[in-house]
A protein has these predicted regions:
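Active-site catalytic-loop/activation-segment of kinase and kinase-like phosphoryl-transfer enzymes
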Residues: 1-10, 108, 141-150, 156-199, ...
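Juxta-kinase regulatory segment immediately upstream of eukaryotic protein kinase catalytic domains
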Residues: 1-29
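Short Pro/Gly-enriched beta-strand edge/turn motifs at strand-loop
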Residues: 20-27, 77, 189-202
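Active-site acidic catalytic loop and adjacent metal/ATP-binding pocket
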Residues: 30-53, 194-239
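ATP-binding pocket architecture of kinase catalytic cores
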Residues: 32, 37, 41-155
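Active-site activation/catalytic loop segments of kinase-like enzymes and analogous catalytic loops
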Residues: 78, 238-280, 294-313
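ATP/Mg2+ or Mg2+-diphosphate-binding catalytic cores
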Residues: 257-260, 297-351
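Amphipathic alpha-helical protein-interaction segments enriched in hydrophobic
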Residues: 285-297
Length: 351
């Protein structure tokens, strides 16, 4: 029977057998909540050391049936090892171990003084430098991984594009529950979403995180640290950018007093990111795809399998109405999209 890391007695026995913990050693365990696709537990030693263990679930913890093979933990472990080399130093936790039999991986924990960026944003704290760092981080990952032969390749034939060619988990955890499910439920956007999903799988430009959001970002000593890599693949950079912009714009919708600042911060993120990748051959054609991915994700987060939990029912209805208008008449640039979305939110709220 597979280990359940949320059973702390069994987890202690497992770590002892694997010689990660000494017999009788005083370690503590704590469930970490917030994700839907994994069990996540922190292991802490008295000397201050800590690990975070992640165990992939076959059935995700949401209100509708949503399944994905727990074998994806192997992708997450491989992605973290690569990102430890690709991303700027200190922006990803250090990989420790993986156990495919138990669909489990371990990484070093970030010290307790950290905060979750999503929580910070929802509290109304908007720090421009955090958005700059976010753009720099994504730009670095996309830029450093975009060459067909990465300077980090470990052996002949191990180009990063081949290492992450499989899009199975991206499809089951992103395209299906976000785009295809929403397409089935929203007739006005069916053609738009289905076409975008097909197009996305044809783009093979760089390493794509697939879950690039404030929820998966910790802030420690004012530095951003990126988590969660289970849908990493070699694909369309526009998805990452649109996914991130969706979170900024949805929070701008939810927080009217911070709306202007969040919109400006979203533009800052886009500009910093654009500067980081402007020399790449695929950069010139990126903007319109980013617009479409942002629109698709904005709709999916109110009509798909994973709705944003902080939006009220009236905000869900408003966002759906506004995004469908953007589907019908799509802006061509990211700044135009941001301005359009904010303007429509303001107009709708006043009526």
């Amino acid at each position: 029977m597979e280990l359940d890391i949320e059973n702390f007695a069994d987890l202690r026995d497992y770590l002892t057998r694997q010689e990660y913990v000494k017999l009788g050693e005083a370690v503590s365990f704590k469930n970490l909540h917030g994700g839907v696709s994994n069990r996540t537990v922190k292991v802490a030693w008295p000397d201050g050391r800590g690990w975070v263990l992640k165990q992939a679930l076959a059935k995700l913890r949401v209100n509708v049936d949503w399944f994905s093979s727990p074998e994806r933990i192997g992708v997450e472990a491989k992605a973290l090892r690569w990102l430890n080399r690709l991303a700027p130093p200190g922006t990803t936790p250090t990989f420790v171990f993986e156990d495919m039999a138990n669909h489990l991986m371990g990484m070093e924990a970030i010290p307790e003084e950290h905060e979750n960026w999503k929580s910070i944003l929802l509290s109304g704290q908007i720090v421009s430098n955090h958005f700059e760092q976010f753009g720099l981080l994504l730009g670095a990952i996309h830029r450093e991984s975009s060459k067909s032969k990465s300077k980090f390749e470990s052996k002949p034939g191990s180009e990063i594009s081949r290492e992450f060619a499989d899009t199975t988990y991206f499809e089951s955890l992103r395209l299906e529950p976000y785009y295809l499910y929403t397409a089935q439920k929203t007739a006005e956007a069916t053609a738009f979403l289905n076409a975008l999903a097909r197009e996305t799988l044809l783009q093979k430009d760089c390493l794509v995180h697939g879950d690039f959001s404030p929820k998966n970002t910790l802030i420690y000593r004012n530095k951003l640290i990126l988590l969660d890599y289970e849908v990493v693949h070699f694909g369309d950079p526009a998805f990452d950018v649109g996914f991130a912009l969706t979170h900024f714009l949805s929070k701008a919708h939810h927080l009217p007093q911070k709306r202007v600042r969040l919109a400006s911060a979203a533009e800052l993120f886009w500009q910093v990111y654009s500067d980081e990748i402007e020399q790449l051959d695929w950069a010139r054609a990126l903007g319109p795809r980013v617009v479409r991915h942002t629109i698709a994700c904005l709709l999916a987060r109110v009509a798909g399998k994973s709705p944003l939990e902080y939006l009220t029912p009236s905000e869900v209805a408003r966002q759906r109405h506004i995004v469908l208008a953007l589907v019908a008449k799509t802006p061509t640039t990211v700044p135009d999209l941001i301005a359009n979305f904010i303007s429509k939110i303001e107009t709708y709220a006043q009526n």
